[in-house]
Amino acid sequence: MTLQQIKEIYLRPLTELILKALEIHNKNFGNDIELCSLKSIKTGTCPEDCKYCPQSGHYNTSIEKHKLLDKDSILAEAKNAKDAGSKRFCMGAAWKHIPKKDFDQVAEIITEVKNLGLETCVTLGSINADEATKLKQAGLDYYNHNLDTSREFYPEIITTRKFEERIETIRNVANANINVCCGGILGMGESLDDRFNLLLELLQLPAAPKSIPINTLIPVKGTPLGDKYTNAQIDSFELVRFIATTRILFPQARLRLSAGRENMSLETQTLCFLAGINSIFYGNKLLTENNATVNSDNFLLAKLGLKSNAELC
């Protein structure tokens, strides 16, 4: 696949693009949707300078910071998530690298969440090959490490971690036979070509991502992008085009509509589902920011006749 071919897919007439994406989607997944829950297990004081992130220690935001949560409180959240219908429990920690003193505790938490009958996913920053192997042994199913944006636009967003470092972590994850969860953020001021290049980078990863989070910028006051923009710099039609193009390029990946969904109308979310979205974060909180409410999600899923994959098991 070339950059020009990606452009040609994206620029098809919108109805034609959505119909093609829906055809591929139905062939591979049918009418199910994956419900995932996300918990911030360590919040704030991150040494990274990601310009969108309220957890960065470089910026003055109003988030409530905390060290790694105790195991029992995390397991209680995981049980609640399972009871609510989630299939996967995702745990995020605001680290550049996981500290050695916390590694064994995180591995133990992964094992115990797995024992609850949930799929496990973590995002812990960069990890080396040995750490990836140990996480796999602990029972980890997915490791999330987003590229965020194109290689070209990346230095405008992050300077404390090189783009190639992200690729290396994904390589370590793939070599440990952990499923790769990798996507990006739209609406940070990137160009259309940057979005095409992000898709090309995802196609060229060491292993094809099984899960692709598609985020839109949530401008948080105190962050550089939050002080620059009042909303994500992408309209609904561009978002739907991006999702449909992603579905065509990744026919067997779970596409997760992630950050920013709270600000989307039910009609926009419906178009996103038609274009290929088949996974959402389910719950009122998304790390430090609000998510679409459970009641709103239940209403929309019922209206559309979508069944969670937990119901289909």
From Swiss-Prot:
Top-rank taxon: Bacteria
Named cofactor requirement(s)? [4Fe-4S] cluster; [2Fe-2S] cluster
Q: Which residues form the Radical SAM core domain?
A: 28-258
Record's function text: Catalyzes the conversion of dethiobiotin (DTB) to biotin by the insertion of a sulfur atom into dethiobiotin via a radical-based mechanism.
User: Family, per the entry?
Assistant: Belongs to the radical SAM superfamily. Biotin synthase family.
Q: Subunit composition?
A: Homodimer.
| Name of the featured protein | Biotin synthase
State the organism named in the record.
Answer: Francisella tularensis subsp. holarctica (strain LVS)
- Taxonomic lineage: Bacteria, Pseudomonadati, Pseudomonadota, Gammaproteobacteria, Thiotrichales
